[in-house]
Regions:
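Juxtamembrane non-transmembrane "cap" segments at the membrane-aqueous interface
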Residues: 53, 57-63, 122-144
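Secretory targeting signals
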Residues: 1, 39-106
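Central hydrophobic cores of alpha-helical transmembrane segments
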Residues: 50, 108-122
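Junction motif at the cytosolic side of a transmembrane helix
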Residues: 99-105, 169-187
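Hydrophobic alpha-helical transmembrane segments
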Residues: 3-4, 75-92, 153-171
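Short, membrane-exposed interhelical loops at transmembrane-helix boundaries
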Residues: 69-70, 135-158
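Helix-loop-helix units of permease transmembrane domains in multi-pass membrane transporters
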Residues: 15-41
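Membrane-embedded or membrane-proximal helical elements that form or frame transporter/channel pores
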Residues: 1-14
């Protein structure tokens, strides 16, 4: 959980005065974005490796300790654990980076309106699932989400699907970030 907070703060601070300094020193927006993405990947990879090793060792010596991956998918598969955590950290970093870029790009009033609209969409989605959609549709959506996270109908776990899901979500957020950074002016 501490790593989530660190990666989130890193993502939020990934766009700062460094952007203005790099633009003024001749770096292109593409290189700035690639450098930021590389920084997130390097730090996320190291942190996920450390969390994987620490989580598995702690669970081995203290069976009451559980890591996030261990609770969801179980222990024993270290490589999927490391890749899953890496992609999860990349997803969190990309989400916060996109948020920081959007807040910087939009003015304060528009940013607040966007936050209120997103909160309204979450409440609307909850209301749709609870009161509007039929139980069959909700069950199909739940089944799709379960399969996207790797849980198959026979009780087996497919590690490829959650890795692809996390990768695609992170890629969407990074593409959104790149689209914003391409149009951002230096203030």
């Amino acid at each position: 959980m501490n790593t989530f907070i660190y990666v989130g703060i890193l993502g939020a601070l990934g766009y700062s005065e460094d952007f203005k300094m790099m633009i003024q020193n001749g770096f292109t927006r593409k290189y700035i974005f690639v450098a930021t993405l590389s920084m997130f990947a390097f730090i996320g990879g190291i942190m996920s490796l450390a969390d994987t090793v620490a989580g598995n060792l702690l669970h081995y010596f203290a069976p009451d300790y559980n890591s996030l991956f261990g609770v969801i998918y179980g222990y024993g598969d270290i490589l999927p654990n490391w890749i899953w955590l890496f992609l999860l950290y990349m997803l969190i970093g990309s989400l916060f980076y996109l948020t920081a870029l959007a807040v910087h790009k939009l003015e304060k009033t528009l940013s607040l309106c966007l936050v209120v609209a997103l909160a309204g969409l979450v409440l609307l989605a909850v209301a749709l699932f609870r009161y509007v959609l039929t139980e069959n549709i909700v069950e199909n959506i739940r089944e799709l989400a379960s399969r996207a996270m790797g849980f198959m109908s026979g009780g087996t776990i497919n590690y490829l699907f959650p890795l692809l899901t996390l990768f695609l979500l992170a890629a969407v957020f990074y593409l959104g970030s790149y689209a914003i950074i391409r149009r951002t002016e230096v203030k």
